Amino acid sequence: WKGERFDLAKILDGKLGGGVRCSRLFWERSLSPEAREGMNAALESDVCVVCVGTGAVFEGEGWDRSEMRLPKCQEEMILQIASLNPNTVVVIFAGGAVDVSAWQDSVAGILLAGFCGERGGAALAEILTGEVNPSGKLSETFPLCLEDTPSYGTLNTPLVSRYEEGLDVGYRYYDSYGIPVAFPFGHGLSYSDFDYSGLKVDAEGQQAKVVFSLKNVSACDGKEVCQLYIHPLNAYVYRPEQELKAFAKQAVKAGKTGKVAFTLTAADFAYYSTAKDGWTTDDGFYEIRIGASSRDIRLKALVKIADGKLEFVKEVPVVEK
C-alpha cells in the first residue's frame, strides 16, 4: 500500500483531548543525538507508543527481508524508551513474522498492525485508547528463529521454492514436529479473558454437532476466535498432528457466558488418497480439539467413524492382546 500516510499521533491527540507528544524517527542506521534527546520525553509521559516496522525499504512483492529482527536502531530505540517508561506499547508495521525476543519482556504490550492502509491510524487509535477491544488472531506461525522455518534451506534460490515439508505446510509443520514457536498459529490477545467449558458432541450418522460454553471472565466486553482442530488417533497413512477444521468469532459481554457451536461432517475427517485418486475417510478414532490457538487447546472430545458414520465415544477401547 502506497497511498496517503496517516498521522497516528494527531489522531490519538484528538481522541484523548490533547497532550499527545510525538518524536519522529526516520530510517536511520543508528540513533542520532537529536533522536536520543527526543526520547527523553518518555520520562514525562504516562504511556509511550513506539511505532516500528519494515516497509517497502525492507520487503515487497517478489522479495523479502534478510532476517526476522527489526533494524538494530529500532530495537535500540524500543529498549531505551522502555527503560525510561515501563508503560511502553510497541506497534509493529510488517508484512510477516517479526522476532521480538530482544525486547518483548521490556514492554507492556505489542500490537501487530500489518500494513493497514489509509484508515489504519484511526483503527489503531481506537484500539490503543480502548474504544475497540482487539480480537484478531494470527493466520500464520511466528517461529523463534528463521532457521526453524521449513523453507530455510531454500532461501535465495532463484525462481525455485521447494515445499519439502509435504502435508505439513504452515502450522502443521511446527505442531507435527513439536517445534517451539514464539507465537503460534491462531494466537491473539485482547482486553478480555475467556474460559472454555462444557464441551458436548452429538454425533450421529453423517454429522457431528460440537457445542461448548465460552465465558468472559473479565470486566470488558470482548470477542474470541474459537478454533476447532481434528487429530487422528490411528491414521492408516501419514497425517499432520492436527488440522484446523472450523473457527468462529463469538462476542460475549463482560461476566456473561455464550454458546459456540460447530457442525462437522464425515468429509471434515477426510484426506486425499493417491491410491484411490480421490478423497477418503478412514474408520477409526479422532480427537476433536477446541482451543484459543493451535498451542492453546482448552477442550477435547472423541468421536469414532465406522463405515463413514460418526459416533461420540467417551474413550478409546483398550484391546487386550
Task: Identify the meaning behind each predicted range.
Residues T263-S294:
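Short, surface-exposed ligand- or partner-binding patches at beta-edge/loop junctions that are enriched
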Residues A219-Y236, Q242-L244:
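Short acidic, flexible loop segments centered on an aromatic residue
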Residues G14, R36-G53, E315-K321:
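Compositionally biased low-complexity segments at domain edges in trafficked proteins
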Residues V52-P71:
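Glycine/threonine-rich flexible loop motifs
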Residues Y236-T274:
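Intrinsically disordered, low-complexity Pro/Gly/Ser/Thr-rich segments with frequent PxxP/GP/PP motifs
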